[in-house]
């Protein structure tokens, strides 16, 4: 309790963790108000709240991404495009989960959104997958092209090292295969195909989090303090 209280009275706005706490708290309040007003049937307030909820939802994923993207000492994290990647991943994984839930409640006879809407959502999911793949491609190209020692080490771990299975599953199973399945209008009308593609997308995003997080953890930040080229030995001297 004391630590939580200290976060409020000694809030450090130079830290992305402070931004994350503020945004997530705001998002929780918005969700609480949304549930209350939906139960009361107050559509006007719900509509007004939606104008605030969307940008805050984007900020939730952006600020989480900045916790990683602003880590200058981490070769695989320090990137300006980290926030767009997180937002794109949230869009495709969130919509994929929605597709699975819609298919489940329709099969249970609880709610049917209609085949046309279901197919349109599947097409939107294919678009989100393409955007996510584009951002990841941009990040990989920017990392690989300079050919620096640190970047090459990170890419080696990611593509052929410890986290390679997660990386390749995300690229092939989480992006390529679902996009191919959903690119066809005929296949988008098949509930089983859409559910399978959605499940692959969710697994792919999970694998992305694994290779993104653990690949950079395996790379040493800096040997010795900043400005000391030969490390602890020079510092003692």
Predicted feature residues:
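Hydrophobic positions within alpha-helical membrane elements
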Residues: 4-5, 144, 213-214
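Short, membrane-exposed interhelical loops at transmembrane-helix boundaries
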Residues: 7, 152-159, 219-236
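Hydrophobic alpha-helical transmembrane segments of integral membrane proteins
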Residues: 67, 207-221
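Membrane helical hairpin/interfacial module
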Residues: 1-19, 23
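Central hydrophobic cores of alpha-helical transmembrane segments
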Residues: 193-203
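Alpha-helical hydrophobic packing sites
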Residues: 2, 180, 210-211
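Long, contiguous internal "core" modules enriched in hydrophobic/ aromatic residues
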Residues: 17, 21-191, 204-207
């Amino acid at each position: 309790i004391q630590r939580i209280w200290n976060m409020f009275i000694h809030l450090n706005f130079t830290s992305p963790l402070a931004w994350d706490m503020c945004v997530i708290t705001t998002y929780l309040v918005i969700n609480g108000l949304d549930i209350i007003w939906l139960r009361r049937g107050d559509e006007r307030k719900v509509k007004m709240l939606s104008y605030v909820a969307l940008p805050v939802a984007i900020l939730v994923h952006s600020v989480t991404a900045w916790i990683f993207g602003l880590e200058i000492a981490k070769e695989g994290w320090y990137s300006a495009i980290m926030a767009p990647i997180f937002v794109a991943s949230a869009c495709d994984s969130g919509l994929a989960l929605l597709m699975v839930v819609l298919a489940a409640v329709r099969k249970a006879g609880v709610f049917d959104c209609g085949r046309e809407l279901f197919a349109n959502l599947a097409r939107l999911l294919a678009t989100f997958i393409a955007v996510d793949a584009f951002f990841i491609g941009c990040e990989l190209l920017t990392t690989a092209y300079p050919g620096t020692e640190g970047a090459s080490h990170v890419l080696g771990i990611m593509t052929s090292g410890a986290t390679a299975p997660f990386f390749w599953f995300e690229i092939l199973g989480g992006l390529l295969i679902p996009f191919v399945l959903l690119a066809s209008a005929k296949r988008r009308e098949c509930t089983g195909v859409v559910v399978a593609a959605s499940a692959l997308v969710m697994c792919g995003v999970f694998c992305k989090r694994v290779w993104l997080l653990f690949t950079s953890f395996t790379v040493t930040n800096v040997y010795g303090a900043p400005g000391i080229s030969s490390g602890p030995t020079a510092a003692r001297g």
